[in-house]
């Protein structure tokens, strides 16, 4: 067993060896290295064909038409292109956007930028289980609302939104629906023929593909228009200029094909490992699961260990590669804004750890993780005066702390 044990699949995934092998075939002189836009020779034609195959593989993952797939550098760019692209194209129709407080920073900061440009954004509060209630979404809708951006699966707590219901509501009001599927594509079934979603952001490195590549699904019927954010040679039907990185795209395509073929078996195995982990640690006193216990993606487990400081717990769990929030914001010592939005106090938010399990996690690793977590919590609580006070029946919320 290799230490530390990788339990941070929501931050990134290793490239599947089958994907890496396909990618390498598109990089060197004796491979398919050409520019897909080179129309005058075989090197270009071969690269174009490889890109077309990958585009179809990604389309098949979500049951879309291959012409609805636009390649980007990742989900952050896809989110920017979707949200800014819609806002700038449809601004004469309205300047109101709805999103939620628990979105990824790539959505929240894009919306903040649009606010500086004169757009109005409503940030919805989730319920205590992390899911946005439909009535809150409907109440926020106005005549000048042009876009709703709600994530499919949350990156910190793993809860799944009812995208069918959100899509129906948005379509009935004539509002465009964008969904950040960075954490769900390849893990949760998505069918754009059945779900009324207009724009979907997809990330390569969250589904065992390479970093630096993603896609944006843009619906053709009814047609969604976007204003380009990246200008140049007019690639991707003018929506996203830049030479297509054949090896990255082939990697994303292969990752999508594997995910589609193995989704059900992966989901069952990963879900069983997650349940094993939770069943192994839930007996620890003052341990709480964050987010809805049922409506969640199989690989995600966000747990608060009360009266233990999150950063010291991270240090104690040096055998486990885990996080105390999203990787994109873990450099800040602020408690997770997602957990704060669920109503957790600073102490509970600070004592939370995100465990995310994936394709290469083993039973042996989970057994070791349970042992390490149990021992670390016991050790840290022995040293904690707060734990001692709690065990003595003192209500810590009522304590008047002296200010120094």
From Swiss-Prot:
Coiled coil: none annotated. NCBIfam families: IscS, PRK02948.1, PRK14012.1. Keywords: 2Fe-2S, Cytoplasm, Iron, Iron-sulfur, Metal-binding, Pyridoxal phosphate, Transferase. It comes from the Bacteria. Transmembrane segments: none annotated. This is Cysteine desulfurase IscS. Homodimer. Forms a heterotetramer with IscU, interacts with other sulfur acceptors. One of its GO terms (biological process) is [2Fe-2S] cluster assembly. Its EC number is 2.8.1.7. [2Fe-2S] cluster binds at residue 328. GO terms for cellular component: L-cysteine desulfurase complex. The gene is iscS. One of its GO terms (molecular function) is metal ion binding. The modification N6-(pyridoxal phosphate)lysine is found at residue 206.
